Structures are given as structure tokens and as C-alpha cells.
Curated annotation (Swiss-Prot):
The lineage of its organism: Bacteria, Pseudomonadati, Pseudomonadota, Gammaproteobacteria, Enterobacterales. This is Pyrimidine-specific ribonucleoside hydrolase RihA. GO terms for cellular component: cytosol. NCBIfam families: PRK10443.1. The active site is at H240.
Amino acid sequence: MALPILFDCDPGHDDAIAIVLALASPELDVKAITSSAGNQTPDKTLRNVLRMLTLLNRTDISVAGGAVKPLMRDLIIADNVHGESGLDGPALPEPAFAPLDCTAVELMAKVLRESPEPVTIVSTGPQTNVALLLNSHPELHAKIARIVIMGGAMGLGNWTPAAEFNIYVDPEAAEIVFQSGIRVVMAGLDVTHKAQIHREDTERFRAIGNPVSTIVAELLDFFFEYHKDEKWGFIGAPLHDPCTIAWLLKPELFTTVERWVGVETQGKYTQGMTVVDYYFLSGNKPNATVMVDVDRQGFVDLLAERLQYYA
């Protein structure tokens, strides 16, 4: 039986590829997709969800837009990474359908309420929508199987020296998620920086030759440009967000540890940092499954295999 998931995202090149992977996988039943502000402004990330679902011929999936800003802060976007549209590079179709006339939280709550079994939430942007859901619907916590997020790291950052972008945008929301009592699975930079797609991998995807694999290759062509800066030390481009979906499909590709994680919301130098109690120094019980390594070739092979679904 397919695993029911709610997908909250802020497309974003890697979010878009995560959507492609999820919808090519019969093991997953995507009940709804909600958008968050983050990689671009909320109007653009919502539009990008609709554009991707139009491309994939999945206009049957319910879509709703989410919070327009973080819980307590002004919005920060990553237009320097993802371009003016949020999905610069390929020629994507215009949306062929409209989002529902409700909020992301209302749609998520409806899906949870109506599901006969607990639902996995996958969140690949700032945690604003998920935190709002948890705060406004405590009666639905038992209907959430786990929350799989892309965010954070153990001791490094990609937006500040200490903080990963998604957590930095809304650290208060991330702290609500980690301390909710619901199991969190964290795909942080420690693993996503190892999930790099190399140029030859992109050509492998392009050679599959269907319209979706071609779009994915073109998304990666654009994504490479930001990540070729030698400060990163990358061979290719890290595919952060698809790690969440890949873990659900093939957890054996990942090495994980069980640890307590908190989020720094006030630090002068460490605001937005995920504090991972790696050596069990805090006395707190683990609240997260933290990914620390990935079989890169297995990850690439999974993407290539699933891209053939769209032939």
C-alpha cells in the first residue's frame, strides 16, 4: 500500500526535482502539495508548484498556498540561487489549473482529518506552514506519522556560517517542529552536500529523452551555475530536497543517527543554527533521525530509474 504524504515546498530547482521523484514513485501517494515562501516569494513558489504539476500531467493533485512570511520575521528569499522565477532555466508550461481557495494549513488539516492512517509530512522549505499546522491543530498530531524535512546541519551553514537557509528563514517555526513530540527526520547539509549531481549525471538524465528528464537536466544546468563557485568545493550541484523523498523510497541509501536537535533563535552569530546533540551531552532524549551520509551513486541511480517513468 502506498505511503500517504503531504508535501510542503518552496520551488526552487531542487524542490521541483523532489516533486518529480515523488510523483514517479508508486510507493508514495501524494495527497496534496502546499507552497511556502522561501526560495522565492510566495506568489512565485505557488505558481511553480502549479507549473510543475502541469508539466507532469498531475493537475488532479490538490494545491494550496501557504504563509506569506515567517512567523516572527521578515521574509528572506534565495533569488541569487534560483533566479527571478524561482525555476529559471527551462521553459516550463503555464499553470493549467488553479490552487484551492483555502490556506495550506486548512488543506493539510483536511487531508489529515480524512486520512484513515497517519500521514507523513515532507517539508523542503522553511517550516512556517508545518509549525502553523501543529500550533493550530493539536488534535491532529496523532495523524502525523513523521515529519521529513530538508534543513539544518551539524555545525556548518550555507546562508550564514552557522545556519542552513531553510532553518535560518524561520528558526522559530523550525523549533516548533523539532520540539513537537512528532518524530522528525532531518536531511541537513551533512548529507545533502554529498548528494551532488555531476555533469555526467545530468547528461545521463538528458539522454533518457523524455520531456520531464529533459526539464530536469535543464534545471540542473541552471543550478550548476551558482554551485560552481569554488568556495563550495563542489564537483557538481547538491540536490538537497530530493534526499527527503529518496529516504522514504530507499532508506538503505542513507546513514542516520538518532539525536536530539534544537534550533537557536536568538544567537548573535548562530541564529538559525540546528544544535545537534551528537555526543548526548544535553540529557535530552533524541527527537530526530539525522541523516549523515548517502550512497551518492545509489541516489543518482534512483533518480535516473524514476525519470524513465515519464517516458
